[in-house]
Curated annotation (Swiss-Prot):
GO function terms (MF aspect): rRNA binding; structural constituent of ribosome
Record's protein name: Large ribosomal subunit protein bL21
PANTHER family: 50S RIBOSOMAL PROTEIN L21, LARGE RIBOSOMAL SUBUNIT PROTEIN BL21M
UniProt-listed InterPro entries: bL21-like, bL21-like_sf, Ribosomal_bL21, Ribosomal_bL21_CS
Taxonomic source organism: Maridesulfovibrio salexigens (strain ATCC 14822 / DSM 2638 / NCIMB 8403 / VKM B-1763) (Desulfovibrio salexigens)
Family indicated by similarity: Belongs to the bacterial ribosomal protein bL21 family.
Amino acid sequence: MYAIIETGGKQFRVEEGLELNVQKMDAEAGTKVDLDKILLIGQGEDVKIGAPYVEGAKVSCTVVEHGRDKKIVVFKKRRRKDSQTKQGHRQDYTRIKVEAIQA
């Protein structure tokens, strides 16, 4: 069984036992989180598509850890102007593990 969920403004295809990084969530490490914005649930040939979300469906997850991604360097240069800007950014994320998908 798989599901397509929406969290942090992005969509992810998840299955039971999968670990993935999502936008930072306000939850302690080791706590359970229920995600209810389920766009699609599929099992073999049987597929339920939400409009926009599947009613009564949820994905139970456990928060594994919080962390920060690799640094992204933003470099802007203006030719012939002797002007340049260098800026770095590290995005916060939450690593979750999918425990169960309930349709």
